[in-house]
């Protein structure tokens, strides 16, 4: 490092101090900040004013097109669109526009922490219990985010990327500017010009599927503050604290004649010309320039995910920590470039191999230029840093090796003529093409290749609404929120697919935690095996009311199928003076109306399940006349009981009695009477025994609860499929009664049917659910079904599943992708995504989300609490039992202990 010394000379002791000696004390030492080009930012025009106080610049932040599991055809289309943007969006001038792109990773999830906290506060239910649960959940998530950003990474990803996986955010910043002369006689001022070009640029980028936003001085300052103060003493190197502590004041709070550049450096930068490095906070920094392309680049060359050997990663993933990539394009008029190429062609005369190669290259360049493939002067620079000169040299060697392996030829540090100047020239908005006369660093690159090199490719980040927080393979947050109307096109109904071992249970516990914490949603869970018992205990721990029900003969649980019969009768009589069962049958079959429930149709379906026992063969024999008889019996049962003055609901035995009455009706044909008797006998099986316990009792009303968990219990066993379907229908009716009554509050309702393949095997249940969920869309009630596979789903479920906008598939095997295709039209791109999902036990599972507005591959790395609550394996139960015995605590407290242990690993 260069010696630090006072400016000027030490006066001799035997001579008087002269005015010249005193003047040296007042000299302003040269500073790197003096070379930074911007002097001000205008909020009204959203432009930066450059050092000449005349030229203007615009800054943007880019979110690249998702490249995970994308086909080569898709990437080629993106490349073509980017090339069009380069060629035709930014006009060419003799004094040209410059487009600079910078890529850097922020090893921090502080923005996600703030976003989640703000999002939760804006949506959380304002009761003491929900606020307590929400604050605890957010705090745990924030600790999880902090743990993810540790320098060593959270884990080694041996399955996909082949490197350490760490939480971070990849930031791509773009600068567009043109230096103008005061007397250039152009008819448009620089600010108007830059904004017109910027508007076209933004429009074209958005049309390509690239996210783009305009940035201001706060964005520039926050970024460069981290760049130039990598180990600030004031915060002991904590860059998140630094950006909070040293945030840029608002315009009205800034001191007179403030200089944005001077505010950026908390310690004086210094340089070491011998080693060609700048020192920021005593850390050496170096610029590495790419001299040439050794071979044609691939689409998304730097930031797109691609296959390399057995691994999938982006080139930028492998660069050393703290690296910054810069691509600087000069939008030069093509006639000037063509003249230059022609000069090369004319001078390439001779029989030497070098001359012949130059001639061939020049001819090839002119050919492609004639086809619209522009040649643009380009400078590619890698900024890197180290903890010491030795560490910097090690990282420089890593960068050079990586560039060479990927077809890019870097200039070796010992061959770099002006390394300190190179660093300064390539800083944001600092490059001036007209001054590059000697030691030219720019190289002519075809726009088709630039369209592959530019960092406009990336990984999906979702919609940005942290209702559900996941990550991508690069460690960046991937968030979306089905319950947010901005993220959905139609509804928030969801289907979650995942074979055993795919992490489906952990995913659903994690989803429930977020839904109850962020929205305070009313939760209903239908499950098998007690997978969500601990989740219920967790909610109860914070004061939420929890009702856990098991479908077992010893439990006082009643789900009467015909409880809505009186309401049905009232509605039908109100609609028409003379009730016509046949007309109602036609209306029920043809209605797509979601304004009002089809109560009679729902009860008919329940009766049909009782009559057929859920047997598909018997259901196939069910005629229209049979259905009409069933409806008549339900209506007669309601009318008779109402006429008798009974206040008790209509029970199954009442419908059986009505059916027996129809079997004795002499006005009917013998065949119909016989069929009515058969159906009455079949339904009578549900009036006694276990079935009668569940479906032929008034029972007691279910308590109001924040969380209701119904364990299928006995009915999940083989041979009880019909009763399970009826039980599921009964709970749906219970839920519907609540959400209809509470439809004017702000609270959403989330209904999860776990192990849905056990429930939906009966085609009639799918028809029933279609009827009921049509209403739920307008009641803010969202049904999610989770299942191991779709193989057991009948074809009749297609209409139901077509109503579900959100499909989440966890690590699906090939056969399951084929099953998905039975119910949902999949594009080749979507099939490719589904095939690409991977898992690494103990670290992560991947899945694919498909909705109308979002299609992406995500990585589930839930917080330890979600994992601990989802642990239902025998060895996991043994672990909790040991903790309970050792610490004399409850099972939930043992869960917290397991979560804390996972957090400290």
Language-model region placement:
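Extended, folded cores of ATP/NTP-driven motor/assembly subunits in large transport
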Residues: 1-444, 455
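P-loop NTPase motor domains
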Residues: 77-88, 314-317, 420-478, 484, ...
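Walker A (P-loop) phosphate-binding loop of P-loop NTPases
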Residues: 501
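Conserved lysine of the Walker
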Residues: 504
């Amino acid at each position: 490092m260069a010696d630090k010394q006072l400016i000027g000379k030490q006066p001799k002791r035997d001579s008087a101090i002269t005015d010249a000696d005193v003047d040296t004390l007042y000299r302003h030492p040269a500073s790197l900040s003096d070379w930074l080009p911007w002097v001000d930012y205008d909020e009204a025009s959203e432009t930066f004013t450059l050092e000449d106080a005349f030229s203007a610049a615009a800054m943007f932040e880019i979110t690249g097109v998702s490249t995970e599991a994308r086909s080569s055809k898709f990437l080629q289309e993106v490349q073509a669109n980017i090339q069009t943007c380069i060629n035709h969006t930014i006009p060419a001038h003799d004094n040209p526009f410059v487009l600079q792109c910078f890529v850097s990773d922020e090893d921090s999830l502080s923005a996600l922490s703030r976003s989640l906290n703000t999002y939760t506060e804006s949506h959380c239910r304002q009761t003491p219990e929900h606020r307590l649960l929400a604050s605890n959940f957010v705090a745990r998530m924030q600790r999880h985010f902090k743990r993810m950003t540790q320098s060593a990474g959270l884990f080694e990803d041996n399955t996909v990327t082949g490197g350490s996986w760490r939480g971070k955010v990849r930031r791509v910043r773009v600068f567009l500017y043109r230096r103008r002369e005061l007397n250039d006689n152009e008819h448009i001022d620089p600010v108007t010009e830059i904004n017109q070009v910027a508007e076209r640029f933004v429009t074209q980028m958005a049309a390509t599927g690239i996210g783009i936003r305009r940035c201001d001085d706060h964005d520039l300052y926050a970024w460069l503050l981290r760049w130039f103060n990598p180990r600030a003493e004031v915060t002991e190197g904590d860059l998140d604290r630094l950006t909070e502590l040293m945030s840029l004041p608002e315009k009205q709070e800034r001191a007179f004649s403030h200089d944005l550049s001077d505010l950026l450096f908390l310690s004086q930068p210094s340089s070491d010309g011998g080693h060609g490095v700048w020192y920021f906070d005593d850390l050496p920094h170096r610029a590495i320039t790419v001299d040439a392309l050794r071979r044609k680049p691939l689409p998304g060359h730097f930031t797109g995910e691609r296959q390399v050997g057995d691994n999938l990663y982006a080139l930028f993933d492998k660069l050393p920590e703290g690296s910054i990539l810069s691509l600087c394009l000069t939008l030069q008029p093509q006639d000037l470039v063509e003249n230059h190429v022609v000069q090369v062609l004319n001078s390439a005369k001779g029989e030497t191999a070098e001359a012949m190669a130059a001639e061939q290259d020049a001819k090839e360049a002119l050919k492609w230029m004639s086809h619209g493939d522009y040649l643009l002067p380009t400078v590619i620079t890698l900024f890197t840093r180290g903890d010491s000169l030795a560490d910097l040299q090690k990282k420089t060697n890593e960068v050079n090796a990586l560039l060479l392996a990927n077809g890019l030829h870097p200039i070796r540090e010992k061959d770099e003529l002006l390394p300190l100047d190179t660093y300064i020239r390539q800083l944001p908005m600092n490059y001036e093409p007209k001054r590059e006369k000697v030691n030219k660093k720019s190289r002519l690159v075809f726009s088709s290749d630039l369209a592959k090199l530019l960092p406009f490719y990336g990984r999906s980040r979702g919609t940005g609404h942290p209702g559900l927080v996941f990550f991508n393979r690069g460690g960046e947050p991937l968030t979306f929120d089905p319950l947010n109307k901005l993220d959905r096109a139609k509804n928030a109904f969801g289907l979650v697919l995942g074979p055993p071992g795919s992490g489906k249970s952990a995913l659903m516990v994690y989803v429930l935690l977020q839904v109850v914490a962020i929205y305070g949603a009313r939760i209903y869970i239908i499950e098998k095996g007690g997978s969500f018992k601990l989740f219920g205990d967790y909610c109860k721990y914070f004061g939420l009311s929890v009702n856990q029900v098991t479908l077992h003969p010893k439990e006082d649980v009643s789900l009467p199928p015909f409880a809505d019969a009186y309401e049905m009768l009232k509605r039908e009589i109100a609609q028409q003076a003379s009730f016509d069962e046949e007309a109602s049958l036609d209306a029920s079959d043809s209605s797509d109306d979601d304004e009002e429930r089809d109560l009679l149709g729902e009860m008919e379906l329940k009766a049909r399940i009782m009559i057929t026992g859920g047997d598909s063969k018997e259901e196939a024999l069910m005629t229209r006349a049979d259905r009409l008889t069933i409806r008549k019996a339900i209506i007669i049962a309601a009318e008779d009981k109402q006429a008798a003055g009974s206040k008790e609901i209509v029970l199954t035995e009442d419908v059986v009695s009505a059916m027996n009455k129809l079997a004795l009706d002499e006005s009917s044909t013998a065949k119909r009477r016989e069929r009515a008797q058969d159906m009455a006998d079949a339904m009578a099986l549900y009036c006694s025994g276990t079935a009668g316990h569940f479906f032929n009792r008034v029972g007691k009303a279910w308590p109001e609860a924040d969380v209701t968990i119904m364990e299928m219990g006995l009915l999940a066993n083989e041979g009880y499929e019909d009763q399970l379907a009826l039980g599921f229908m009964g709970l749906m009716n219970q839920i519907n009664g609540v959400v209809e009554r509470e439809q004017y509050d702000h609270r959403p309702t989330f209904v999860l049917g776990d192990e849905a393949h056990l429930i939906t095997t009966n085609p009639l249940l799918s028809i029933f659910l279609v009827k009921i969920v049509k209403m739920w869309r307008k009641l803010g009630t969202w049904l999610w079904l989770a299942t191991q596979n779709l193989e057991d789903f009948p074809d009749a479920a297609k209409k139901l599943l077509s109503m579900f906008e959100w499909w989440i598939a966890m690590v699906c095997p090939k056969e399951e992708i084929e099953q998905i295709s039975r119910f949902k039209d999949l594009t080749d791109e979507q099939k490719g995504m589904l095939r690409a999902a991977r898992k690494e036990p103990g670290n992560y599972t991947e899945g694919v989300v498909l909705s109308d507005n979002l299609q992406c591959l995500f990585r589930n790395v839930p917080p330890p609490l979600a994992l601990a609550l989802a642990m239902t394996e025998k060895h996991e139960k043994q672990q909790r039992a040991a903790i309970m015995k050792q610490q004399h605590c409850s099972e939930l407290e043992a869960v917290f202990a397991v979560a804390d242990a996972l957090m400290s690993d």
